[in-house]
Swiss-Prot record:
Gene: Sys1
Name under which the protein is recorded: Protein SYS1 homolog
Topological category with respect to the lipid bilayer: Multi-pass membrane protein
A GO-annotated cellular component: Golgi membrane
Compartments, as annotated in UniProt: Golgi apparatus membrane
Record-stated family: Belongs to the SYS1 family.
Residue intervals passing through the bilayer: 13-33, 65-85, 91-111, 113-133
A Pfam family the protein falls into: SYS1
Keywords per UniProt: Golgi apparatus, Membrane, Protein transport, Transmembrane, Transmembrane helix, Transport
Quaternary structure, from the entry: Interacts with ARFRP1.
GO biological process: protein transport
Length: 156
């Protein structure tokens, strides 16, 4: 159906490159947020903050700051969905994919499956925030008016 508006073409290379790009955005921005938080509280940065499920918690200040970094990262990644994915229908797919690979990364890093309830809660909140805000931003872009002519308007 060549005449269909916004027809979707299956392009595995594009999808793989978008997955890699979103993983890069996810870990790059998470690293920046964690570095900023560590600089503010004069803490030493560690990969444990990113990949150890036991770090996240309400009882310790580093745990709360790490949770805040994850939530801020979800907002930043929603902008990544807007600029790199650009389709509201695909935001949830890419969000879940990014977090699934993060789950695998945490599992490999700590050699055990994440079992901390706070880790799962933070990931669920981040998935919801990233998907909903990313979809909202993408839909706003998709619903913009399409200019039909480049001629200047005349007031008649």
């Amino acid at each position: 159906m060549a005449g269909q508006f916004r027809s979707y073409v299956w392009d595995p290379l594009l999808i793989l490159s978008q997955i890699v790009l979103m993983q890069t955005v996810y870990y790059g921005s998470l690293g920046l947020w964690l570095a900023l938080v560590d600089a503010l509280v004069r803490s030493s940065p560690s990969l444990d903050q990113m990949f150890d499920a036991e770090i996240l918690g309400f009882s310790t200040p580093p745990g709360r700051l790490s949770m805040m970094s994850f939530v801020l990262n979800a907002l930043t990644c929603a902008l990544g969905l807007l600029y790199f994915i650009r389709r509201g229908k695909q935001c949830l797919d890419f969000t879940v994919t990014v977090h699934f690979f993060h789950l695998l990364g945490c599992w490999l890093y700590s050699s055990r499956f994440p079992s901390a309830l706070t880790w799962w809660l933070v990931q669920a909140v981040c998935i919801a925030l990233m998907a909903v805000i990313g979809e909202y931003l993408c839909m706003r872009t998709e619903l913009k008016e399409i200019p039909l002519s480049s001629a200047p308007k005349s007031n008649v």
